[in-house]
Amino acid sequence: LWVTLDNGIAQIHVNSPIYFYEPLEAQIGMVHDMVIEKGIVYLATNQGLYALSENDSYPTLIPGTQEQTWYISDVGNQLIAGHNTGTLQLEGRKATQIPGPNGGGTALRKTIIHGKEVLLQMSYRPLSVFTRDMVTNRWKFSHNVEGFSNLIKSFEVDPTGNIWASHMYKGIYRLRLNEDLRSVQEMEYIGKLEEGNELSLI
């Protein structure tokens, strides 16, 4: 569809699958992550964790989640969010803190290392391990990994079990954990690549 305007011509893609959302009232800040679960859109932002459903005019803040929320992740039977105050579990529009690590969860990955299925969470400082409770089938905090404490924004785990962690401001770390996942067995800091190559965020 072509439209003639006072200052030119505009093309409108009528059947485009892309929608643009412009909030009318809520100032939700910068969006870091998003998940859609049971008809609710969850937005992890630097102002808190917001929810938006079909019947809502604009996103609303989930109570108790003010401040920085780095990620929200669907790990099968749980929605988990990394928040300034700790690791949150979401049910509908209710957030409760998972006992264990304190504050600053920046990224979460479900992975298998040394034959163990775990959740790994990076944060402002420690690397945390979550294991599945065999009774409730829910993820729970297990322990912090010894030997690594850094400000990590994102990470990935490769098929051989190497953890590649991107620092908030400088370089990348390659980590290997010991068999019981309780300490770092190997650590390599990669500050720069060979001349002509550039580092990028993981």
Residues of each region from the PLM?
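Carboxylate-rich, polar loop motifs that coordinate divalent cations or form catalytic acidic clusters
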Residues: 1-202
